[in-house]
Regions:
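Intracellular juxtamembrane helix-capping segments at the cytosolic ends
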Residues: 144-157
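C-terminal membrane-cytosol helix-exit motif in multi-pass small-molecule transporters
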Residues: 1-23, 208-216
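A late C-terminal transmembrane helix in Major Facilitator Superfamily
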Residues: 159-191
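Extracytoplasmic gate region of multi-pass secondary transporters
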Residues: 34-95
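A membrane-interface helix-boundary motif in multi-pass transporters
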Residues: 186-204
Length: 229
């Protein structure tokens, strides 16, 4: 009886082994962090990926100067923060199924559009309605980025070294947020007011959207990592 049970167990194990092997062989190639650093497409992505955290941090840091420039009440502006949170939450929940159905690469070309519209609005008017509208648009881009970036690295570079690659991306994002207040402050000091900065940043984000759109077809094709040195 023991021998027959052992034989049955071994027979059941063999197909599973074959299935696992087939799954392993069909996996897309995974890149190491060193290989990612040698990928020119990674550096082409960075100006757009780092733009949103840079801009959002800079604006929130200089919010007092912003409301003084617009002749708004600081209390009114800060009361709009719940709109930012609601927008970011709703878009985050909606972005997940979109990525599941299409891909993070598909979403890449869209997630900066709300922030670009919000900056264009701030640059063009001092009306009070611009504050809540901007918070909603900024939250939409922030929520989309939170979900999209987590999936993008997997789609582009595989999941075997995901921790190392994500840590690289997060480190660069932290660096961009750290320098944003200083850069925007220096520009204010040299005479480039916030409205002008918002207009330039809106144009910059539109260029990033165009670049992402042109790059997306290349990302949909499976790419092999360069040989390790």
């Amino acid at each position: 009886i023991w021998c027959s049970r052992r034989l049955n167990i071994r027979c059941l194990e063999r197909p599973c082994n074959r299935i696992v092997s087939a799954a392993e062989s069909s996996e897309s190639p995974s890149w190491t962090r060193a290989q990612v650093l040698r990928d020119p497409w990674f550096y082409a992505l960075l100006p757009g990926i780092l733009a949103a955290p840079f801009i959002i941090t800079g604006i929130l840091f200089h919010q007092v100067h912003l409301v003084e420039t617009k002749d708004w009440e600081l209390q009114m502006f800060t009361s709009c923060y719940p709109l930012y949170a609601i927008s970011a939450t709703v878009v985050s929940l909606g972005a997940g199924p979109i990525i599941d159905r299409f891909s993070a690469v598909y979403l890449l070309r869209f997630y900066l559009v709300p922030l670009a519209l919000g900056l264009a609005l701030l640059a063009s008017t001092d009306a009070v309605f611009a504050a809540p509208a901007f918070m909603l648009l900024m939250g939409a881009s922030a929520g989309g980025a939170t979900i999209m970036l987590g999936a993008l690295w997997v789609e582009l570079y595989g999941n075997k070294h995901l921790g190392a690659i994500r840590s690289l991306g997060v480190s660069l994002i932290v660096l961009s947020t750290a320098i944003a207040p200083g850069v925007m402050g220096v520009l204010i000091d040299v005479g480039l007011n916030l409205n002008s900065q918002f207009g330039l940043l809106a144009v910059y984000l539109c260029l990033c959207v165009v670049v992402f759109t042109l790059m997306s077809p290349s990302f949909l094709v499976e790419r092999r990592p360069p040989a390790q040195v």
